[in-house]
């Protein structure tokens, strides 16, 4: 089983990387094993937290925190729509959510990475930088996403949007690492991507016989929520951190008293991410059925109740993007998203169509993936725009905000135009393919039962159309010159998705995501008595 795979199956909360290791942890573990611990350990809960926190800075800093721009570089207004080249709505919806992620967009527009990148081809960070720059600086236009964004993933049919989202995030994480050398996992957790999307879980098992405590800390990039018995995101989070009793056949083998004993297991967030990606588990691996129930999600979410430390103030996140799947099962459907522009206005991004939306409409969707950002981060970016401190996105005083693809390409060889690049596609495909990526995932999870969802075919009455799709009638009939798919579709007659027009629902087809289960890898534990 490869360590670099994004999903290794098993318990979902430990699905990204292997456990933290260091000489300090090994030494502490060995010392605990050698000594007989009293019933109450002198180490407090705060001491254990500090010990774990100290492990991460020891890793080599591949993308120091000061590299993240401190002020916003994004234009205040909404950017471009994305052309659907046939069964690519899942790509477009995911890219729009990433494009309007403030820390990521600001880093891309600062050009920190491309100025030092030596890979030139096959670099996902450089490819995303080119895409985000074009999208944000071409409001009112429709652009074609680069083929390199989905090389090795798209196979001519609709795929799962969340899988593509995390495939892209994982590719950007790997692009932060130097070359193709093997890097330890603590160092991987210091990359730019982990700084933005990453945090740490704490899984704590307390022996009820000797009161010994085992803490395991694991990194995460997204959080999957079981919604079968939940009516809201808050309820799903409460179920996630609810203590689990281990007794009977599931009794815990304690490393302190060296016997099987009843225990209590609790999962909490040890550190919080700047940006939270919450995935609502709506699909079944076995049947492909979808839970079409409404799950409430707030505009502002307090994550403090789910943290390891409860003695601090509120930890408020604000919603800035929602990825939606419209359809009845993973075998058919259409993806679109809602994003919040820097100016604070919400927009519906449905392929080429960009329409203004109200917060009421945003919060009434059957969401698939929710994107939250810490309130302090959002306010900092918003204040810099309101004060007129927006820096030039391309780093030159007289560069036009609507930079052309040719200008970007001349600035740096990594920034490729959206036209096809056979060498880039070939290399990207060789490095990571969908089949290889999915081979690393275990398929032994069960999912919720199927419920039919009614799909509305009209836009809300309060929606203002900013610009309509130039391809609303479909490329097949009116744009024969664009029959060749941007994302390397099959030469056989493909199925083209059409952008949703006002009062018309796009074609529903394709397949959707698989749920993520819980990862039950072996754990390196730090045993402490209390």
Curated annotation (Swiss-Prot):
Cited CDD domains: Peptidase_C19E
Tree of life domain: Eukaryota
InterPro entries cross-referenced by the UniProt entry: Papain-like_cys_pep_sf (IPR038765), Peptidase_C19 (IPR050164), Peptidase_C19_UCH (IPR001394), USP_CS (IPR018200), USP_dom (IPR028889)
Protein known as: Ubiquitin carboxyl-terminal hydrolase 17-like protein 13
Active site: 89, 334
EC number: 3.4.19.12
Broad class of enzyme this protein falls into: hydrolase
Composition bias, Polar residues: 493-505
Protein family according to the UniProt entry: Belongs to the peptidase C19 family. USP17 subfamily.
Domain USP: 80-375
GO terms under cellular component: cytosol; endoplasmic reticulum; nucleus
GO BP annotations, alphabetical order: protein deubiquitination; proteolysis; regulation of apoptotic process; regulation of protein stability
Gene name of the record: USP17L13
Pfam families membership: UCH
Listed GO MF terms: cysteine-type deubiquitinase activity
Reactions performed catalytically: Thiol-dependent hydrolysis of ester, thioester, amide, peptide and isopeptide bonds formed by the C-terminal Gly of ubiquitin (a 76-residue protein attached to proteins as an intracellular targeting signal)
Annotated Basic residues bias: 510-524
Residue numbers spanned by region Disordered: 382-412, 477-530
Keyword entries, A-Z: Endoplasmic reticulum, Hydrolase, Nucleus, Protease, Thiol protease, Ubl conjugation pathway
